[in-house]
């Protein structure tokens, strides 16, 4: 995971080479994102948490800003909503419109075949896909119609301890 070394501020990428930097190089090509994780101990997997921490800390915030994001979690039984809330924090702090569905974006099952039996979960995923596609079309239509993006607010930092 991210060790908070700050090297990314100087390098423009994570100091540790690998999948995070490979993914970050492709951010500009994406119109939106779907991030998903299995649930381990009522949280997103350690691998996904480490990936998201490093990606969102080291990549330029402009690469995420105003690009729609959805998060999905999958578990055998429980913990999906806690993991879902955990993953929502990343797009929530980078000005990404969060795409929702008709329920929390969770499916249940240990294997892909099991998930297909989760009729409600599969429906939630279909609605999520439709909503993501619709929002992407709305953004494109807004750009074509000349609707300006919101102006960038100047950075303001506050420490809680003074």
Language model features with spans:
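Short secondary-structure transition/capping segments
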Residues: 1-4, 47-48, 110-114
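Cysteine-cluster motifs in flexible loop/terminal segments that predominantly coordinate metals
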Residues: 1-27, 156-162
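A short alpha-helix capping/helix-coil boundary motif
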Residues: 2-4, 65-68, 143
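Helix-loop-strand module that forms the ligand-binding subsite of alpha/beta enzymes
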Residues: 13-105
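Glycine-rich phosphate/pyrophosphate-binding loop and the adjoining helix
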Residues: 97-162
């Amino acid at each position: 995971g991210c060790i908070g070394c700050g090297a990314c501020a100087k390098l423009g990428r994570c100091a540790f080479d690998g999948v995070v930097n490979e993914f970050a190089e492709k951010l500009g090509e994406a119109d939106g994102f779907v991030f998903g994780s299995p649930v381990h101990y009522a949280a997103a997997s350690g691998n996904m948490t480490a990936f998201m921490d490093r990606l969102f800390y080291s990549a330029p915030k402009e690469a995420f800003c105003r690009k729609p994001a959805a998060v999905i979690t999958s578990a055998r039984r429980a913990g999906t909503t806690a993991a879902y809330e955990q993953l929502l924090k990343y797009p929530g702090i980078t000005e990404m419109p969060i795409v929702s569905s008709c329920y929390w974006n969770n499916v249940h099952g240990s294997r892909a075949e099991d998930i297909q039996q989760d009729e409600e979960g599969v429906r939630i995923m279909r609605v999520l896909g439709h909503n993501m596609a619709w929002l992407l079309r709305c953004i494109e239509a807004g750009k074509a119609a000349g609707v300006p993006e919101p102006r960038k607010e100047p950075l303001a930092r506050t420490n809680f301890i003074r």
